Every structure is written in C-alpha cells, then in structure tokens.
C-alpha cells in the first residue's frame, strides 16, 4: 500500500498531481459556476454600460443577459420599484429597451448639459402657448390683448410682425377665450362671435384674422381645435361652446357651422374634441337641476345631422358659483375613460368609464367612481402615450394622469385601473402651500409648475426629482408658471415654460447609440388620415411651404416699406430725384440745406436793415413832433404883437396857424 507523501516528499509526479487537483477545485469556485439566479441579482447592481460590456465577456453571460428577466431585475433595482410596479411604457415592449432608454434619459436630465434660452415674446402677459417641435416654431398668445407672436425658442428670435385677433390689427376687442394649434388659432368673443387665423398656405388668407359666418347668442366660454395639420374642406376643425348652452362645429377653411347642438338651461364649461376616435365630450352646468352633466357625441368625424348628445353622468353642485372651482376635464379615449375635477367638500377626481357603453350602446355600461384628493384640484394633464398596449408589456400597459392641487401636491394616477383605492400610484410634493398651476408629462418625465414661480422635472416611475427649470428666490419676483409644453417624443428632451411675459426653453441631449434603438409601435385602432396631407419627415412639405410663406411675407413687407418711403420722398422733393443713389441724395439734401441757410442769413440781414431804417424814421418823426410842440408855445408872443400888424399880416398869420393845427 502506497503511503501519502509527506511535506518532504516533493517528487515531480507528486507536484503535478497536487497542482492538477488544486486547479480543479478553483474551477468549481469561479463566478462562471454560480447559479443563474445569483448572477442575475449580481448583474442588477450594474449600470447599463456595464451590463452591455458584461454581455461581451463570454457565451454564458451573453446567453444569460439575452434573457429579458435579467434586464427586468436590473430595471426594478435601478428604479427602486417592486415587480408589480405600474408605469407608462417607453420602449418597444422589452425590458432591455425600457431599462436602457429610461436610465439614459433620466441621467441626461440629472447630469446632462444642454441649451437654455429665455426671452421676451413681446405680447405682454402670456396666457396661451403652442410649440411645433417639428418645425421649431413657438406660438405665444395673450388673450387679454388678442396678440400672438411667432418665435424660435432655440435662438430667442421673435418675428417682427404680430398676429392680431381683429381685422384692423387693433388691441380693442371683447375676446373671452383663445386656443393655439399647429395651423389653427381659434378665438371666442364676449358677443358670441368666433374667429380664426389659419397658418397654412392651403387657406385663402393665411396668417390673416377673419370671423366665422355664424355666431353664438352669448359669450364663448371654451374652444377646442385640432392641434395637427389643417383638415380638408367639409370636415370639422374646431368646436366652440357658449354661455347660452350651444355648441358649434366649424369648418375652419370656409367659416361655416357644419353642426350645432343646444343644451337647454345650461352653460358649456369644457370640450374634449377627439376626431381620431370620433368622439366629442361636452361638460355642462344645468341651472335648473343645479348639477354638472357630461355628454358624449359618438361617431363624430364629419358633419352628420342624426347624432344626438348622450348623457353619461350627472354630478350635483354643492357650492355657489363663486366657491366652485373651474371644472377640469381630460379623456383617455383609447380606453374609453373621462376624468373630471370636483372641488370642496368632495376634493376628488371623477372617473367616468364609457368603454362598455361604446361596445354595447347601453347606458348601464357607464361606470362612475371618485378618486379622493387632499386638496382642491387646480391642474390636470394626461401623458402623451396614446397607444394601445397589452398588459404583457412593461408597466402593464398603463397610461398616467397627473393631478395638481392647491397645497402643492401632485398625484400620479393610473387611468386604466377601475379600483379607486389603487388608482393613485404615488404622491409628489412639488412646492408646499402654493397651488400647482400647470402640469405636462410624457412616458419618462413630468414637468410641474407652481404659483410660486417654481418649475421642476420629475421621474414618472419613481417620482424622484430630476431637474430644476426655474425658481424665484425673491418673493416680489414670483410669477406663476402658466403654460408648460414637452415634446411628445420622450427621446427628444425639449420643452418650454412661460413666466409672466417671458418664455424659457431647454434642450438636453442623450447619447446617439440609444436614440435610434426604439422601434415604432403602431396603434391597433386605425387613425383618421387625410389623403392631401403629407407624411411626417425630418423636413416635411408643410415646413417647406411655411418657410416659403414667411419669406414671401417678409419680401412683401419690405417692398411696402420701400414704396411708402418713396412716396414720402416724392412729396418732399418731387419726382425728379427718383433713381438717385443714397450718396447723391445726401449730397443734394446737404446742398439744399446750405442754400436755405444762405437765404436765411440774407433775409436776416435785410430784416436788420429794415429795422434800422424804421428806427431812423421813427426818430425823425419824434424830432418833428417835438418841434411842433415847441411851436405851439410861441404863438402867445406873436399874439402880443398882433396889434402892431396891419390887416393883411394878421390874415396871413391866421392862415399859417390854421395850417399848423391841421
């Protein structure tokens, strides 16, 4: 029997055997031999770049990281969420894309640098805003004066000519409401009239204000118009509501009311016009019943006379008109859900689901529930992810709704859940004790504006703070953030806000390797498309036409200015100088001024000579007057010797005295 080698028995064969056994034991203890569950947990601590690098280490890791489970675990570890977290999906349906894109965008907001521009739009207090991100044009409006300016947020350049809500370009009007879109600007007046400005070459009078052919009987309260391209003639492009309970649907090209609805003893509070889903939602207040009523007009794309409003829900009014806050409304037409705000003492968001009603055409299918809030709602906004998604996609195919209240809180709500107790996903404190004035959100970021002048960017998944856009430290300079806009494409980190009469825009960049990796997800439901509209591209036909239109307008304006200057020149100098160069005209004007100066000096010398002559003449007249006065005192001496004169001498003396008196 062979004995074990001792510490002194180190032959070559024994050393080789010991090294072979030691290497086999080390191989069993390497990371490659760990269970995949442990490796997935280890990988979840890595950032996206490290995960991509680890995928290139070996075949086993590449196979392991090709599984979507690894990226899902890393996603929830990075965003501090649980496996049942609900959010609006961003990528193409895989956890890998969701983790890479969302982490890159949030890091760009936190650490990235970009362009920030702040400038004055030259229209006063800003109340309306629309940003055409495809063409880079920003439309800023002030409904108090009825003026609109066109500017470029990337450079801060504002066009010289302003658009006015009047035919004569005056600021005196009775404007009650206004809305801005890509090619349609709608205006409502206190006397019931409705006007439009079309920003398209397809219109007969582009960039010119004109009234519609019909009007309401009372003041216009709300307007909703298409935010995209101009619809064809004969289709509805704008809807208006009035205090008299009437709703008109307008063909913006011709100004004709294609269809109208009358709600008896009611006031129109808000409208939700969605031609993509052929829906029109009308929220009214009935004076007789003292209640708010929500109506639906389905099958609504063209002018059809057989459609009648359908009552979906009725909400009892518990406060007076002065205490009740304005009713806010938005709708997720893809899911068949509408959301309406209610003030104290309810302080809630009413959720009205009419999806089953659309499928069964029965009022029993309408479901209403209330989502309680801590304060009076002041702002409401729906995210831009208008896609039909299944629950198997990341985030369970949810769509988010953000609600701000008077206490500075923001509630993130899942629009697709029916349980009101599970509807609120998270609550964010933006700025305490100041009401939220406006909210805008997409799949990744949510921008919140406060009445204190604060504006910040938050993550929609975790609610974490990402970026501060504006903040007024001085209380005297705190202006509320009235309007907020974000690009509907979450990969484009662009946005604008309004601060009193100023606009602040930002544009951050993300690494290019992540930009083009998002595959396009088409909606399941067909959308309304027009044959005469060009498809969207990097530089579309509409943008080219818009640039040509602006160039032609600029040339025409310069030509008019030259004609006015020429007419004024002809009035002053005549037609003989037309055609001279600028230097020749300056020389001619200088010569005329020198001649005028010489004439003035000659006239001045002549006036001085005349004054001297007049002075001499007056002096001579004064001397003669003194002599005459002295001669008047001499006759008494002559009278003393009259007795010595004969008769003929006395007659001559009398005649001489009479002549002197004359």
From Swiss-Prot:
Residues 1-27, 617-645 are annotated as: Disordered. Keywords: Cytoplasm, Repeat, Ubl conjugation pathway, WD repeat. Residues 581-600, 646-662 form the UIM domain. Pfam families: F-box-like, WD40. Coiled coil: none annotated. SMART domains: FBOX (SM00256). One of its GO terms (molecular function) is ubiquitin-like ligase-substrate adaptor activity. Part of a SCF (SKP1-cullin-F-box) protein ligase complex. Interacts with skp1. This is F-box/WD repeat-containing protein pof10. It comes from Schizosaccharomyces pombe (strain 972 / ATCC 24843). The gene is pof10.
């Amino acid at each position: 029997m062979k004995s074990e080698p001792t510490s002194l028995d180190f032959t070559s064969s024994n050393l080789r055997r010991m090294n072979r056994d030691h290497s086999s034991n080390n191989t069993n203890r390497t990371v490659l031999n760990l269970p995949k569950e442990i490796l997935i947990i280890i990988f979840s601590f890595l950032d996206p770049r490290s995960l991509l690098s680890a995928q290139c280490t070996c075949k086993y890791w590449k196979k392991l990281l090709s599984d979507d489970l690894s990226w899902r675990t890393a996603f929830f570890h990075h965003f501090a969420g649980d496996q049942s977290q609900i959010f609006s999906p961003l990528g193409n349906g895989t956890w890998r894309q969701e983790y890479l894109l969302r982490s890159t965008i949030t890091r760009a907001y936190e650490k990235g640098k970009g362009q920030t521009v702040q400038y004055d739009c030259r229209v006063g207090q800003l109340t309306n805003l629309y940003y055409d991100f495809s063409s880079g044009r920003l439309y800023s409006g002030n409904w108090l004066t009825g003026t609109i300016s066109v500017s470029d947020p990337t450079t801060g350049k504002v066009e010289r000519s302003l658009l006015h809500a009047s035919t004569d370009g005056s600021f005196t009007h009775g404007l009650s409401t206004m809305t801005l879109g890509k090619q349609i600007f709608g205006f409502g007046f206190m006397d019931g009239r409705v006007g439009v400005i079309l920003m398209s070459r397809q219109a007969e009078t582009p960039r010119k204000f004109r009234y519609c052919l019909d009007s309401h009987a009372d003041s216009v309260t709300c307007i909703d118009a298409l935010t995209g391209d101009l619809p064809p003639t004969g289709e509805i492009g704008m809807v208006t509501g009035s205090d008299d309970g009437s709703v008109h649907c307008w063909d913006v090209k011709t100004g004709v009311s294609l269809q109208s609805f009358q709600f008896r003893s009611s006031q129109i509070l808000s409208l939700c016009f969605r031609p993509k889903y052929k829906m029109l939602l009308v929220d009214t207040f009935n004076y007789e019943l003292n209640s708010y009523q929500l109506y639906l007009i389905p099958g609504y794309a063209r002018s059809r006379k057989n459609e009648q409003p359908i009552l979906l829900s009725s909400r009892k009014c518990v406060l007076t008109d002065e205490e009740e806050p304005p009713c806010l409304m938005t709708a997720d037409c893809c899911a068949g859900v509408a959301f309406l705000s209610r003030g104290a003492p309810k302080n809630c968001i009413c959720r009205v689901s009419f999806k089953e009603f659309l499928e069964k055409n029965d009022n029993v299918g309408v479901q209403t529930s209330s989502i309680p809030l801590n304060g009076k709602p002041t702002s409401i906004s729906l995210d831009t992810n208008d896609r039909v998604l299944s629950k198997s996609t990341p985030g369970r195919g949810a769509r988010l709704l953000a609600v701000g209240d008077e206490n500075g809180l923001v509630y993130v709500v899942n629009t697709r859940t029916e349980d009101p107790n599970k509807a609120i996903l998270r609550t964010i404190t933006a700025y305490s004790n100041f009401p939220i004035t406006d909210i805008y959100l997409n799949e990744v970021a949510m921008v919140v504006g406060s009445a204190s002048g604060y504006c910040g960017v938050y993550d929609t998944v975790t609610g974490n703070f990402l970026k501060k856009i504006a903040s007024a430290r001085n209380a005297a300079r705190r202006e509320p953030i009235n309007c907020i806009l974000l690009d509907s494409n979450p990969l484009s980190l662009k946005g604008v806000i309004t601060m009193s009469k100023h606009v602040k825009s930002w544009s951050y960049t993300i690494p290019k390797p992540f930009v083009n990796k998002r595959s396009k997800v088409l909606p399941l439901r067909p959308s309304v498309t027009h044959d005469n509209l060009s498809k969207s591209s990097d530089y579309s036909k509409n943008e080219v036409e818009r640039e040509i239109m602006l160039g032609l307008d600029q040339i025409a304006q310069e030509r008019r200015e030259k004609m006015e200057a020429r007419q004024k020149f002809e009035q002053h100098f005549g037609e003989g100088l037309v055609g001279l160069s600028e230097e020749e005209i300056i020389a001619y004007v200088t010569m005329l001024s020198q001649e005028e100066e010489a004439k003035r000096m000659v006239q001045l010398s002549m006036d001085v000579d005349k004054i001297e002559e007049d002075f001499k003449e007056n002096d001579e007249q004064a001397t003669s007057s003194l002599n005459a006065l002295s001669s008047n005192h001499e006759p008494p001496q002559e009278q003393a010797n009259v007795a010595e004169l004969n008769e003929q001498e006395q007659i001559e003396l009398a005649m001489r005295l009479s002549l002197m008196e004359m």
